[in-house]
């Protein structure tokens, strides 16, 4: 289970009563993102969880999940510009992170797109290729 690489503070952040409708979505997103590599990790900051290629604080970020509000989760992915699917949104105001190009907004009841695992792998590969 990749939850051992998910910052326990992130799980705690989405464990309050208001997060019940989105907690499993967050855990599922994290599973997709962390399963791209045995080295990938997720670290909570104040309002987002950054998914990195490895565990050092300075390691590249390939995805970010904003958990600012329990009404929605916004996930940004570092996809190559020519490979950003039409189903993803461009960078959203106030939710910018360097290198992220495609954004997915999930609210209670929304399904994670079937392609999300592929997008996560592509984002991870894209960031690793920048080194």
Regions picked out by a protein language model, each given a short descriptive name:
Residues 95-131:
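Well-ordered alpha/beta subsegment
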Residues 32-37, 41-44:
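A mid-sequence, solvent-exposed acidic-amphipathic segment
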Residues 9, 20-27, 86, 110-118:
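Generic alpha-helical secondary structure signal
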Residues 1-31:
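Charge-rich, low-complexity N-terminal segments
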Residues 25, 37-39, 63:
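Append "and, occasionally, other polyanion-binding protein interfaces
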Residues 43-103:
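Short, conserved beta-strand/beta-arch hydrophobic-aromatic motifs that form part
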Residues 30-34, 121-124:
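Generic solvent-exposed, charged/amphipathic alpha-helical segments
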């Amino acid at each position: 289970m990749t939850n051992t690489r998910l910052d326990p503070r992130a799980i705690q952040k989405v464990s309050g009563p208001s997060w019940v409708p989105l907690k499993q979505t967050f855990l599922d997103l994290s599973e997709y993102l962390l399963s791209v590599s045995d080295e990938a990790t997720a670290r909570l900051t104040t309002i987002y969880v950054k998914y990195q290629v490895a565990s050092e604080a300075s390691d590249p970020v390939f995805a970010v999940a904003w958990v600012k509000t329990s009404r929605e989760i916004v996930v940004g992915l570092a996809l190559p510009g020519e490979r950003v699917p039409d189903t993803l949104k461009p960078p959203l105001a106030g939710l910018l992170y360097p290198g992220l190009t495609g954004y997915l907004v999930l609210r209670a009841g929304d399904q994670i797109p079937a392609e999300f695992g592929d997008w996560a792998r592509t984002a991870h590969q894209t960031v690793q290729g920048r080194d």
